[in-house]
Amino acid sequence: MAEINGKTIETERDFTFSEAEYNQLMEEQRKERMKALRRHKLPEKLSLQDALLALTKQELEDIQYNLNLPMGNLNRTKKADMVAAIEPEVVNFVGRWFVSAFQEQKDIFDYACQHKGLLKDLQQEDYRLDYLRGVGVLYCGLQDGEMLWYMPEEIQAEYEKINNAAYADAVNLNTEVMRLAAGMVYYYGIIDYDQLYQKVCDQIDGELDFADFMGIIFNGGCWYPQVVTTEKDLMHESVMNPEALQTAQRQRGMVNYADFPYDKLFDAGQESYIESTEAYRALAQYFMKQKQLDVLQAAEAVNSINMILQNGYGMKEIMGFLK
């Protein structure tokens, strides 16, 4: 089985998918997520302690896990004891984590600090907020029936310690590094971190040590949907069978990764990027004229076919997708 643009596909027998089933599953997950988020009330005081006390024990354990903290028996541990143990660790963690932030994340943190910690205009459906919540940076709660996200006072204080011109430059570099890395896996599919580090460093002007690079990459793997981090490699989300791709790479022995110019990599690092070749434009025009698809539908169809071909499948699978 494989998944292309939300469509489950049988790649070994009949090439089929059920978009309706996929959409139903996504809707169920959305409802469960919102139900879980809306169980919390906005604390009167936006302190870190009150934010943590508002969480369930399971949610506190999730933060422990994400921060690689010691974990005891959940049923035998008092919630107050969990909060007392987690609170200083969250403060220590965010002080280190902020250095890997991207511009989009910085914009959120700046807004929070400018509005006493409150974030009123975030897209509630953005699952990436759950990542920031899972590492203790942001929290949420209901106020008069409205869902609000917020940054606790202690987290704001840690952020303000480093939020200066030098930090803004570092965030720009982080954003550039992740954009280039995402562009590379768009073309390569998958690449190990050592080689990725060397290739990214060849493209940038600033200095970057490997530890900082890995912090950027792992932050990016949780923030950018088009990339996936593994233990040893970064890969593009369109790769269906990374093991087969790595085997093919090893079989080619001394054949190196192709070099691409900076602009090409930077463009390819965009979310939902599609390289607009002549073949792409011709096929998209065909879908619009012959199948009455709109521009976005045609682009999605061409991108899906491109993913099928990139993953080693052929005309049989393409015809199955088009049925």
Model-derived features: positions:
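Accessory beta->alpha helical hairpin/"wing" motif in late/C-terminal subdomains of nucleic-acid enzymes
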Residues: 74-91, 139-167, 227-247
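Long, charge-rich, low-complexity intrinsically disordered regions
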Residues: 227-320
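Non-catalytic interaction/regulatory modules that flank or connect domains
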Residues: 180-219
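Short alpha-helical segments that sit at the start of domains
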Residues: 80-104, 162-178, 273-280
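Basic helix-extension-helix modules of the SAP/HeH family
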Residues: 2-150
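Short, amphipathic alpha-helical interaction segments positioned at domain boundaries
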Residues: 94-97, 153-188, 240-267
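Short capping segments at the starts of secondary-structure elements
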Residues: 55, 103, 115-120, 186-194, ...
